[in-house]
Amino acid sequence: MPADYTSTARALSLPMSPAESLSPAEEDTRPLWSHLASSRRNTASPSVRESTGLRDQVVNQATKMLRRTKKTWRRLTFWQRIGAIGAALLAILLGLSFMIFTGQVFFWLGPVAEKWEQSWLAFFVLWLCVFFVSFPPLVGWSTFGTISGFIYGIWKGWILYATATVLGSTCSFIVSRTILSKFVNRMMERDKRFAALALTLKYDGLKLLCMIRLCPLPYSVCNGAVSTFPTVHPLMYGLATALITPKLLVPAFIGSRIRILSEKNEEMSAASKAVNICSIILTIGIGVFTGWYIYRRTLARAKELEAKERADIRRSLEADHAAHRPHGSFSEDPDVNTAATTLARDEEERIGFNDFDDDNVDLVIDDDSGSEISPNLTKKQFPGPYRDEFTDNDSDVFGDGDGPDSQMFRLHTHVRSG
């Protein structure tokens, strides 16, 4: 009984927080349930932490998106809200109609596919369709790729799809940049996130562009969005699109399998049908997983490059402030310098530096007679701002008397107008 009482009392006296490891003698005196609870807690904690962390990330992202949506909604006027609701309903209707149309188009193409396969006019018309859907906000790029494979087979359809995609995306990039030039300049000067993303393309621009092109993003919208980054050149964007053209084999392959299933459905055995259907499903799954994985890697790489760029700018700002010299240009490229300057303003706010002119406030001190100093004083009368820099040879400013009748001191300090 005393032994049980002693072990129970010792177990109850253990702290709630994780304690240091006990000696072997003390470990033997711990009750059995203490060992079981400790082992169960240590075993379950990694998975619990992982699931909790993933759940928290999803909840945080959803909360941020909801908060941003509410904030944007409150800023809209009455008619803007009506227009937003109408645009959302129209987008839903167009999406449903497009899904229905996509399902029916292969039934319509079945009887004419063999005839169109030998027609160069049909080849050119389909090529133009792929070319023009590269311009935002048109849709149907993936559907036309599947149709190319359906009519011309995997390899000829891929050639049609790839060439039209490369030329169309490059032309869309150039046109979008010309039309959206004012929007680009405004975004570069005001939006720090936009400036940061533009600077990330300065390091491994071609590699990051290829990753962006492989992401499952709306094709035409992506062409217009990337064109707003001034650090991306049209030829580089066209080269990145050409490098990822093997990805376009996926819709062409799916289209060719659909034609085989539609034409030889009665002649094919159940095993052949299963192989074709499974190949389509597997190809779609590989494409979705690859796009999702590359999308995650692209975001991670963009964050890494942004952190590196911010660190370089922060070091430059701290060095300039320590040496009491003005900030120079960050790059000889004007577009890169504009983006870096926007990011530098954000870093100055984070660090606490302020070099704005509104911090230099002129204070006018009147004498007893009420006379005021004219605002048109020359720099010759007052050669420079007042500085708190004294040496042993300086006299006491408070012991020299009042000095002139009135003085104006330029104080480098924060003064808020009352």
Curated annotation (Swiss-Prot):
Residues 1-81, 141-157, 256-273 are lumenal. This is Golgi apparatus membrane protein tvp38. Keywords: Golgi apparatus, Membrane, Transmembrane, Transmembrane helix. It is found in: Golgi apparatus membrane. Residues 1-10 have a biased composition (Polar residues). One of its GO terms (biological process) is vesicle-mediated transport. Residues 149-258 are annotated as: VTT domain. It comes from Aspergillus fumigatus (strain ATCC MYA-4609 / CBS 101355 / FGSC A1100 / Af293). The gene is tvp38. The chain crosses the membrane at residues 82-102, 120-140, 158-180, 235-255, 274-294. Belongs to the TVP38/TMEM64 family.
